[in-house]
């Protein structure tokens, strides 16, 4: 069986959905903007909360454990049970983590905030990659490249925004950035609607294509009799 046949929706069966590709790439930009914002805040957090370099390292560890190592687990689960709205759910975790980060007044609070921001990323990426492939219409290289450009742009944008709006200011200014995951939540909810519709169409087509099971011989004989 081909990989396309195993996927929830065979990408080559649909024309390239450029609108969805652009939307999921924009979602990737917004997600990675917040992901790259956290390391850019380390000098501010170190000064405002009097953190040691060891504590900064632990924040990075908590962030990377949830953002990176948890991703394959999420991917395994969603391969078996696709979750169209996990895209928006991931952005929701990022939003909660960002708000907590803005008003954290202790090291444990920052640690939890970093873990939540990382968790949002790990939930977002597996299904976002799947959506990019589904919307590719068979142009997998183009779709993946466009999706990756969004993420790379976000990684570059986060530190720049931190330097412009947060550096040399109060930690609470981080709250200004809640607009980013809020926009992302709305955008990815709409992508989730499209994803859910594609899954429903695929399942309906699979049911129509399934061969009709023959009636048991006993039922046939009973009906004739």
Feature roles, as predicted:
Residues 36, 64-72, 155-156:
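Residue-level signature of mid-helix packing/kink "hotspots" within the transmembrane helices
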